[in-house]
Curated annotation (Swiss-Prot):
Domain of life the protein comes from: Bacteria
EC identifiers of the protein: 2.5.1.145
Residues at which a 1,2-diacyl-sn-glycero-3-phospho-(1'-sn-glycerol) binds: 156
InterPro entries linked to this entry: Lgt (IPR001640)
Protein name: Phosphatidylglycerol--prolipoprotein diacylglyceryl transferase
GO biological processes: lipoprotein biosynthetic process
Stated role: Catalyzes the transfer of the diacylglyceryl group from phosphatidylglycerol to the sulfhydryl group of the N-terminal cysteine of a prolipoprotein, the first step in the formation of mature lipoproteins.
Species whose genome carries this gene: Chlamydia pneumoniae (Chlamydophila pneumoniae)
GO molecular function: phosphatidylglycerol-prolipoprotein diacylglyceryl transferase activity
TM helices/strands, residue ranges: 18-38, 68-88, 107-127, 135-155, 193-213, 222-242, 256-276
Gene that this sequence comes from: lgt
Subcellular location: Cell inner membrane
Membrane topology recorded in Swiss-Prot or TrEMBL: Multi-pass membrane protein
Amino acid sequence: MAVIYWDRSKIVWSFEPWSLRLTWYGVFFTVGIFLACLSARYLALSYYGLKDHLSFSKSQLRVALENFFIYSILFIVPGARLAYVIFYGWSFYLQHPEEIIQIWHGGLSSHGGVLGFLLWAAIFSWIYKKKISKLTFLFLTDLCGSVFGIAAFFIRLGNFWNQEIVGTPTSLPWGVVFSDPMQGVQGVPVHPVQLYEGISYLVVSGILYFLSYKRYLHLGKGYVTSIACISVAFIRFFAEYVKSHQGKVLAEDCLLTIGQILSIPLFLFGVALLIICSLKARRHRSHI
């Protein structure tokens, strides 16, 4: 049986006297966020009908978007960390509270990151509602919903490189044997579930970006956000079935993992938003 053996170093650079380390996960995380922000800014400036808006200049819009992306990290990362602490390691962090801020030891939840982003989008749109009224909550979330897959792909690629969030054992020819996995069994071929997820997110996001970029379909406000939320929840829910769950279940007899439980509210939010947007679009068409 042909398998892939993964034995790459997790460290790019280290300075032992000060215990400083640059990990490949950190590199992929940074590159993914940076490329996603660049793509979103380009899309907003060129293809979302803003460049001809008379109430503000293109440079003002560029600065506003850059501020939005830069400061979003202050909500995404803490949100991801807090959700991980609460849902994935509460008993441990209750005994070792000093570890909560030691984010370099690992431990981020994508669901918490999404919640942190949505909170920041709401705050930012409120701050800018008089300066640039076009930057509404749904505009910002639609914009990022078109490019989220870029960041998600690189983050999952970082997980793969870091040998974490590994899959369950498999006999498929593309099974991966990790030399030093953070979970699961060493020396056993497993599903490269990190790549399953990352590629799926990238495909969904690519389709949404293409539709927004080419404007082949007239997607109204909120549609990209709702489709992105539904897709992410769907992908994450089923990816959990081939993940090594590290005991992250609500109880021994529970059929769902915490990752699946947390995906349900995201799915419901996406469905509710899709229904609301569809009803508004229908009412709008009836008045034309």
